[in-house]
């Protein structure tokens, strides 16, 4: 399965509206950022190992420029699922208009992976030190920006006054902006910062305040109608995805190679192939460890939302002035209703299949 970045205009032409004739088999997943090996490998593994086929699914992915561009596509049923961060959806409850008819059904990133990163020799060592600086993000439509602004406010900074967000593009273009001094810091996820370090650039990471650590990150979201009309489709897709994550945790080297086979342009060129494979394997393993295990190393229930932690994170966002209040119907936004069905499979059989995959 190849990932393609296309314009909104092309997306409108390429994606048929969600319909009953397609719903049982064809799934289009809208992503907010281009996939890299750490988050794209499970899709490739699900394809190669037959997990999508076992669930009678044909899965396609499309990349939009941030959650702000992605969410309207899910709300209008132009795509089946989206994989955005949660802040824009929560924010929609405060805009004085009708809330988006969307609901999350699978927690893809149950721990906050966002952070600030500066060059290792930078004098910036704390969030407060970012005063008067420029922070790079992929696009100003990114759904992660509200969380970053809240982190800045907890340190006494006012975004737009004391510190400025600058669009620098994703991955390599953002890395270059930091290395060249165009910006002072990046506000990327930890896996992207891992990639920057592995490329030879020494950085210093600055974590968000602890209260934001277990807030919901990216997850699979769909139109609320699909909970009523097509719950089995949601279960089958998420089950295949979960199998792929477990397979990649078991055999990350295979999953890296599967991702490169599906996306040859993503394979590093001009570098030692063994080193590139080792680095990518480490990157994927780190990501899956954060997603599938808690901080103490115990396993999470794949896809499950910690609603109490999410509510605490919303309260922290409200306290920081990012939300006008914490009065949000968390249960209407995040659902655990399908999690037991999603995880109803033989995980050890998946691991055995993964161990022999090449």
Task: Label every PLM stretch briefly.
Residues 122, 172-273:
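Pocket-lining segment of extracytoplasmic ligand-binding domains
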């Amino acid at each position: 399965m190849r990932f393609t970045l296309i314009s909104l205009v092309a997306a409108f032409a390429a994606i048929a509206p969600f319909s009953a004739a397609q719903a049982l088999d064809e799934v289009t997943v809208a992503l907010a950022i281009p996939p890299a090996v750490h988050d794209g490998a499970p899709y490739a593994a699900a394809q190669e190992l037959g997990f999508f086929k076992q669930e009678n699914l044909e899965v396609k992915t499309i990349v939009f420029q941030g959650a702000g561009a992605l969410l309207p596509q899910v709300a209008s049923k132009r795509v089946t699922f989206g994989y955005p961060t949660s802040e824009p959806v929560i924010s929609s409850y405060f805009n004085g208009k009708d809330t988006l008819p969307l609901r999350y059904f699978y927690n893809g990133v149950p721990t906050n992976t966002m952070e600030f990163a500066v060059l290792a020799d930078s004098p910036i060592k704390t969030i407060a030190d970012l005063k008067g600086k420029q922070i790079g993000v992929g696009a100003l439509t990114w759904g992660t920006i509200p969380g970053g602004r809240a982190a800045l406010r907890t340190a006494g900074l006012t975004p737009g006054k004391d510190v400025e967000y600058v669009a620098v593009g994703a991955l390599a273009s953002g890395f270059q902006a930091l290395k060249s001094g165009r910006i002072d810091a990046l506000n990327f996820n930890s896996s992207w910062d891992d990639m920057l370090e592995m490329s030879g650039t020494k950085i210093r990471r600055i974590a968000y305040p602890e209260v934001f650590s277990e807030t919901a990150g990216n997850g699979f979201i769909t139109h609320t109608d699909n909970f009523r009309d097509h719950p089995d489709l949601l279960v089958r897709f998420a089950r295949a995805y979960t199998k792929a994550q477990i397979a990649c945790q078991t055999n990350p080297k295979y999953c890296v190679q599967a991702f490169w086979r599906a996306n040859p342009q993503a394979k590093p060129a001009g570098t030692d192939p063994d080193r590139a494979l080792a680095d990518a394997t480490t990157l994927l393993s780190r990501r899956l460890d954060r997603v599938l295990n808690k901080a103490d190393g115990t396993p999470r229930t794949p896809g499950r939302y910690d609603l109490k932690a999410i509510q605490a994170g919303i309260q922290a966002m409200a306290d920081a002035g990012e939300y006008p209040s914490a009065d949000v119907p968390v249960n209407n936004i995040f659902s655990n209703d399908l999690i037991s069905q999603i995880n109803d499979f033989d995980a050890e059989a998946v691991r055995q299949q993964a161990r022999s995959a090449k």
